[in-house]
Every structure is written in C-alpha cells, then in structure tokens.
Amino acid sequence: MTRTFEVTPDKASRMQAAPPLSAQKGTMVQHSILIIDDDADIRNALQLVLKKAGFHPLLAESGQAAIALMEQDEQAAGVAAILCDLEMPGMNGATVIAHFQRHYPMIPVLVLSGAAPAQFLDAVGQQGVGDWIRKPATNETVLEKVRGAVHLFELRKAGRRSKDRPST
C-alpha cells in the first residue's frame, strides 16, 4: 500500500512506524529535522511521519520563522536535515535555502514542492540542495530521503571532526 504525506493527522497517527535510529552503542540517537512549509496540514503530517520514525521534528510555517528558530532555539543545534517547501509566501524557498546553505553548510536541505517553475529549480540547483521530494510523496520516500540526508550530515560531521584533530 502506498501512503503519501498528504494525509489527515488522524490517518498519519495510524501509520506503521519505522524503527528508530540507533547509535553504535545501542543508545537512541534522535536527530532533529526542520520542516519549513506554509501548509499546516503538510507540516503536521510530516511531523507525525518523522516522529514515528524516531526523529525530532521542528516546525516552521515560513522562511522567516525557520531562520528565527535556528537562531534562538537550543534544539536547533541538533538539526541534521532541513525539509523546505519551495513555493511559500513572503520569503520563498530558494531564498531560505540560500540562507541555510550560507549559515549552516553542513546541514543538507531537501526541497519539497508540488510543481516548481524552472527558475526555482535552476536557483536551488546551484545551492547544493541535498535532494528533491515532489509532493505528494509516499511516507516511505520521505523517510528514505530524510535518512539519506541525515547520513550525509553524519558524514560531513565526521569529516569535520577528523580535520579538527591534530596530525601525528
């Protein structure tokens, strides 16, 4: 059965949960995922899907709210991936993505969009976007892309740690 993240919260709450992410020593690793979308139904459905999979979703209804959250919220320090709608009122997704790529280059950004004009695709393609999720997407696709982004974040973080160690 194929499920999409365009579900009502009551349906999303009944979805089968994926196993949580675990660390090497068996302790729970709960990565934060920032969801930026002006559609409350999509934000809430994604929140349920990601929470059931063991992630800690942080929600923002606009680019401005997402930037403020990352600057002020202590939990934002643990953000391992960002899901950003491309078409939003006010600050559009391309502008938001450019901000996050400048200020948080280690965090992969996944673009969410139902239909994006070519100029947006060109703009985000030059900004190192991690991947693309076309709306509507199955929950499995969303989780696969998010897990891939978290894996990329962990690789970047590990690479940074190895660069910070003194040479012997």
Stretches with model-predicted labels:
Residues 39, 82, 86-87:
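The short loop immediately C-terminal to the conserved phospho-acceptor aspartate in CheY-like receiver
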Residues 40-58, 127:
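Two-component/phosphorelay signaling modules centered on CheY-like receiver
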Residues 59-81:
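Acidic, metal-coordinating helix/loop segments flanking the phosphotransfer/catalytic sites
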Residues 61-65, 89-96:
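Acidic catalytic/metal-coordinating carboxylates
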Residues 68, 94-106:
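Short amphipathic alpha-helix used as the core "switch/output" element in two-component signaling
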Residues 95, 116-133, 144:
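Alpha4 helix (beta4-alpha4-beta5 surface) of REC/receiver domains from two-component response regulators
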Residues 119, 137-150:
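C-terminal output helix
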